[in-house]
Regions:
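Beta-propeller blade repeat segments, especially FG-GAP/WD-type strand-to-loop junctions
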Residues: 1-30, 65-88, 127-143, 173-199, ...
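Acidic/hydrophobic-patterned starts of short beta strands in beta-sheet-rich repeat architectures
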Residues: 51-61, 109-119, 160-169, 227-236, ...
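A generic tandem-repeat structural signature
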Residues: 68, 78-157, 162-167
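Repeat-based blade/solenoid architectures
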Residues: 32-44, 88-104, 144-154, 199-221, ...
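Structural signature of eukaryotic scaffold interfaces centered on beta-propeller domains
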Residues: 45-51, 102-111, 154-160, 221-227, ...
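Beta-propeller domains
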Residues: 212-252, 262-397, 414, 418
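Gly/Ser/Thr/Pro-enriched helix-cap/hinge segments flanking short amphipathic alpha-helices
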Residues: 2, 11-14, 19, 255, ...
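Short, structured coil/turn linkers that connect adjacent secondary-structure elements
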Residues: 61, 72, 119-121, 135, ...
Length: 619
């Protein structure tokens, strides 16, 4: 088998994507694998449509306005994605429609499979349509509903009641659309300010947030930022060349507002991750005009006593100290190296590189399993010998950042790269790459650092015969590394909320080269209390110890409104498992031989002793 480090002819390179698998397990590095994505298709979402616990890939072909899905199967060491027939056709009244956002989750209670919420805009992004596709028990085909939402959207389970809410902008105000427990054909709409506390409703009005469009260019999210185990809502908005970062902290009853503002021309869409490995989520912004990123470090006090009740400890500490929820990031531009750090990604000739596009073209993922998310970025280059877009990987480890050479530049230069994202093709806990060209998709298998360990988790909500990813959940682990240092790490499970982000459909945490047991793994989610009707309760479970290279799948169901967790552990063996088993068997045989030898020797000595005693008796 060839890989891209070896030579290919021009015709072979041209036809490389689309069939079978390339690369051998004996090769280290990043290898191109052939996949059967159709020409002109684009990856738009991940989902488990057939409820087999594997992740399927959703694609869209604009030429035919068709949505397809590729179901994952494993057959004789081959990882195959079987293409479906057309799931449904998109019909839009817009000129030159562009699919902006695809969210596969549960919106209608009577659906018998995951629903598709699709946001479409035109080239100028001044017109939007929002389409919902769903199945009910009467028909096995997708039904269509136009939600009459003509703005960009953000989706989250804001109330924690297992019903997805859609935040949108209409009539110069922010509104929330949802279907609720009792399915209404037209849904229900309420004002965005209803989720805010009285004080913060006033604060949001003063900032004019409530009548300001939120942006899909700079990112939105639904994650726990302040460590109290309740997911917080992050929105971005822009006005007069100022970018506003709005953070709505989730208390047990309402949301409290915190906001920051800075010049809009400096940054692109933000990323979230634990970039300093202190069990708190930080925010990273790429610079638009230079190959740099700035990480704003979470300023909440980390809890390093590894107590099972750390959520309550953090919440109580902040309540006692300030009688309110402390600001996470203090001020964005304090002259304090502990608050933020700007990192040069490209050291040499950096003036020739800029990030490609403002939106979603940089990704975070721990592809090196170091315990800190790395970066996948697309750059435009002004070098005379290469004016195309190029892809680079950057790995964080402790206090340094390293560029990882894909060794695929010769091939990738021939593509008109549109975007790139992470995926786990082989379900083996390695973050592979999907690279979207203008007319085709290529896939790159990560066979780097096989001696590093990971844990891969997800919480899904059981809805009848299918399940969907839960919003606002997080995972936290505690581990001791090979140097004897104890550390903790947090990662958020972030299903798609807005924009063409295509986030990972699971929470992935690298462990590095520590092959010790994971001492504690905490899985955290929230539930709606039907009795009080508006109180969020925290569901938290601790697993100890956990073997590295494990996938934890938690299926969260409800019986009589009580939460029921079903746990599945899938252990991914290391590449050297066979050798390890052979060595163990050989050692066991050696031990068995020694035991038999010693036992035989002892029996012979006993016989000789008995013979001597017998002769002595008669003598």
């Amino acid at each position: 088998m060839k890989n891209l480090q070896e030579s290919y002819t021009e015709s072979e390179l041209k036809d490389l994507a689309g069939k079978g698998i390339f690369g051998s397990k004996g090769s280290d590095g990043y290898l191109l694998i052939k996949t059967n994505f159709g020409e002109g298709e684009k990856v738009i979402a991940y989902a488990d449509l057939n409820n087999d616990k594997y992740t399927d890939i959703i694609t869209y072909k604009q030429e035919k306005n068709s949505i397809y899905f590729y179901s994952y199967t494993y057959d004789h060491n081959q990882y195959i994605f079987n293409k479906s027939e057309v799931l449904f056709i998109l019909n839009s009244t817009l000129d030159n429609p562009i699919v902006k956002n695809v969210i596969v989750n549960s919106f209608i209670k009577t659906s018998i499979s995951p629903d598709f919420l699709i946001s479409i805009s035109n080239d100028d992004k001044n017109k939007y349509e929002t389409h919902l596709f769903y199945k009910n028990k009467n028909k096995d085909e997708y039904l269509y509903k136009n939600l009459n939402i003509n703005s960009n959207i953000v989706v989250a389970d804001i109330n924690g009641d297992r019903n997805m809410e859609i935040i949108f902008f209409k009539d110069n105000m922010r509104q929330i659309f949802y279907f609720g427990d009792e399915y209404s054909k037209d849904g229900t709409i309420k004002s965005f300010d209803e989720i805010l506390s009285s004080k913060d409703k006033e604060g949001a009005s003063n900032y004019k947030f409530l009548n300001k469009k939120f942006s899909d260019k700079y990112g939105n999210a639904f994650v726990d930022l302040n460590g109290d185990c309740l997911p917080d809502l992050i929105l971005t908005s822009e006005e007069d060349q100022i970018l506003y970062l709005e953070i709505y902290y989730h208390t047990e009853e309402k949301y409290n507002l915190d906001s920051y503002s800075f010049k809009i021309g400096e940054y692109g869409a933000f990323l979230i991750g634990d970039f300093d490995r202190n069990s708190q989520l930080d925010i990273l912004f790429p610079h638009l005009n230079e190959p740099k990123v700035t990480i704003f470090y979470n300023q909440f006090q980390s809890n390093h006593n590894w107590d099972e009740n750390y959520c309550e400890i953090i919440k109580n500490n902040n309540d006692v100290k300030e009688k309110k929820y402390k600001k996470v990031f203090n001020e964005f531009f304090l002259n304090d190296s502990k608050t933020y750090k700007t990192i040069d990604l490209i050291k040499n000739n950096s003036q020739n590189y800029t990030f490609y596009g403002k939106e979603t073209l940089i990704r975070a993922g721990d592809f090196g399993s170091t315990g800190i998310p790395g970066l996948l970025a697309i750059f435009k280059t002004n070098e005379t010998n290469n004016k195309n877009k190029i892809i680079k990987l950057f790995e964080f480890e402790k206090d340094k950042i390293t560029e990882v050479d894909l060794k695929l530049d010769t091939y990738l230069e021939k593509m008109d790269i549109q975007y790139a994202t992470f995926f786990d093709f082989a379900e083996d806990g390695r973050l592979d790459l999907i690279i979207q060209g203008k007319d085709k998709i290529i896939s790159i298998w990560n066979n780097n650092s096989p001696d590093k360990f990971f844990i891969k988790n997800k919480i899904v909500l059981k809805k009848g015969k299918f399940s969907t990813l839960e919003f606002g959940t997080s995972f936290r682990y505690v581990v001791t590394d090979n140097e004897g240092l104890r550390s903790d790490n947090v990662v958020a499970q972030m299903p798609q909320t807005s924009g063409m982000i295509i986030p990972l459909p699971f929470a992935y945490q690298g462990i590095g080269r520590s092959n010790n047991y994971i001492e504690h793994l905490y899985a955290i989610s929230t539930s709606f209390d039907k009795v009080s009707n508006d109180i969020i309760s925290v569901n938290k479970d601790s697993f100890t110890p956990i073997i590295p290279n494990t996938q934890l799948i938690i299926t969260k169901g409800y019986e009589k409104e009580k939460v029921k967790w079903e746990i599945e552990l899938v252990v991914t063996p290391t590449e050297n498992l066979l050798i390890l088993l052979i060595v163990i068997i050989i050692i066991l045989f050696i031990i068995l031989f020694i035991i038999i030898f010693l036992h035989s020797k002892e029996r012979n000595e006993d016989k000789e002793q008995d013979s001597d005693n017998f002769r002595a008796w008669f003598a």
